[in-house]
Amino acid sequence: MNGATPGSAAAPAPVPDWRQFCELHAQVAAVDFAHKFCRFLRDNPTYDTPDAGTSFSRHFAANFLAVFSEEVRRVLGTAADTMEPEPAVTSVTSALKTATYGHSRSSEDVSAHVATKARVRKGFSLRNMSLCVVDGVRDLWHRRASPEPEGGATPKTTEPVSEPRDKWTRRLRLARTLAAKVELVDIQREGALRFMVADDAASGPGGTAQWQKCRLLLRRAVAGERFRLEFFVPPKASRPKVSIPLSAIIEVRTTMPLEMPEKDNTFVLKVENGAEYILETIDSLQKHSWVADIQGCVDPGDSEEDTGLSCARGGCLASRVTSCSCELLTEADMPRPPETMTAVGAVVTAPHGRARDTVGESLAHVPLETFLQTLESSGGVSESNNTGDEGAELDPDAEAELELSDYPWFHGTLSRVKAAQLVLAGGPRSHGLFVIRQSETRPGECVLTFNFQGKAKHLRLSLNGHGQCHVQHLWFQSVFDMLRHFHTHPIPLESGGSADITLRSYVRAQGPPPDPGPAPNTAAPVPACWTEPAGQHYFSSLATATCPPTSPSNGAGASSSSGSSSSATSVPPRPAEGPLSARSRSNSTEHLLEAASGATEEPADATLGRARAVENQYSFY
């Protein structure tokens, strides 16, 4: 019962399996460290992160290998070389059986065998056992991490002492360090968010949204994909519940107040398959930061979408960029005032439709400096828009309606795709080229689309009833003040940082074909009717009048702007534009106004009057 004595002649017991020995003590150390790790997190909650377990265990394993190697080297240097192995073998065998079947695996089991280890060293050849422990720890890491190629075969009892031990230790440390570095490089961003699928909001109890906690991971993928966005639900899950390649994301934007009235820090992801994910961050800074990072990976130049844009191949963009609700987009061709913007005789004409289905056509690029100089020389737009007695009767809302449609950089309801193609026509050489268009998704607002180093950027412009322009955190008295500011100051991009982008030139919108018009010194007739082609989406513009003039009649009030005037001058007549603004365009989607049946003439003393269209009529399909 007390084991064999040194003088006994009994047959030697079989040597226990070294793998079982390693696994036993590894489990004991792991259980002990796990309990202490959990206790440490409870005492220090600041370290309680989703990847805390991985970081702590890696650091523990690295230090374990270093301390283990040094301790084995120290013990082997001081231990005696003459030890009797047979009693030690019997004692260790009984100890292993007792620890396996009788007791729980804890640190006490390890301390129980301290007295036995000194007698075991010669029989077990601890110089080789160090290699076994290293190999066992490496196998445990292989089960948790990605598989790595095996470095060699199982060590034998006849191998050399020091060189294999040091070689295996160095190789294991180097392999784990390189793997960790590669993983950190592949991860672009990681954070804890809440998300829901847009379709799940109505399926919940009472129609409430089903929010879930997740760990969102933006990483560089393999096998051809540039980046992937992965949702880990729950956050500590080892495998993602949803994995989306960024090439399949067609839209990333912050939510509107009407979409999420009770949530301020949310943004939307729209995927090609029709799925929509709404994600919530803890503050506005994280929201804009996530949107900027995702857009930076999907943005033109970083994906197939922008490669097509930069090469002016618009066909590949139809499935990636949000398109206008009007498939057959046609716009009315508005005549643009000459650069001098001098008030001359005006002619009211019938609307002329223009279709811009081929964006690859050659359009003029006009320096913005020329427009601003002309604007300053003419004394501003208020005089040119309010000449005559009738202009004095306009309220501020009516004045705001006259500010966009009259100018060549405004392209109306040009779609997002075609606007991007226009500004990217010259590639990076057209840095700073811009157009202003009506927003497709937000009625009543406009979008500034510009070329940023060969990439198309879209900046939202909000206009109020007084003509004031709001761009992100900046307020301007008018759109022209905004153009002046961004002509000399860089545009603040959502991605932050210093952006060297100023507005340099604009794409001049196409005008209608030249019309013969009435002869000089002849008063221009006022049309009494409007003709609207069926199924056509257009702006109201002015061409040669085809309806006979009507007698003076009582027009509408000053706010309705239904009256129009004309005057005889000695200079050739110039087409004038009707009132058009983002606000009036948005209202037209709900109220389709009927054309006025008549018009009023201006008093004779108004020599330089400016005729305006009766009403704007739109139809959205």
From Swiss-Prot:
Effect of residue 437 to A: Abolishes interaction with phosphorylated INSR
Keyword Cell cycle tagged: no
Tissue: Detected in embryonic brain, spinal cord and cortical neurons.
UniProt keyword annotation of Iron present: no
One Pfam assignment: Phe_ZIP
Post-translational modifications: Phosphorylated on a tyrosine residue by NTRK1, NTRK2, NTRK3 and INSR after stimulation of the receptor by its extracellular ligand. Tyrosine phosphorylated by JAK2, KIT and other kinases activated by B-cell receptor in response to stimulation with cytokines, IL3, IL5, PDGF, IGF1, IGF2, CSF2/GM-CSF and cross-linking of the B-cell receptor complex.
GO terms for MF: identical protein binding; SH2 domain binding; signaling adaptor activity; transmembrane receptor protein tyrosine kinase adaptor activity
Family annotation (PROSITE patterns): PH_DOMAIN, SH2
GO BP field: actin cytoskeleton organization; antigen receptor-mediated signaling pathway; B cell receptor signaling pathway; B-1 B cell homeostasis; brown fat cell differentiation; cytokine-mediated signaling pathway; insulin receptor signaling pathway; intracellular signal transduction
Protein name, per record: SH2B adapter protein 2
Upper lineage: Eukaryota, Metazoa, Chordata, Craniata, Vertebrata
Gene: Sh2b2
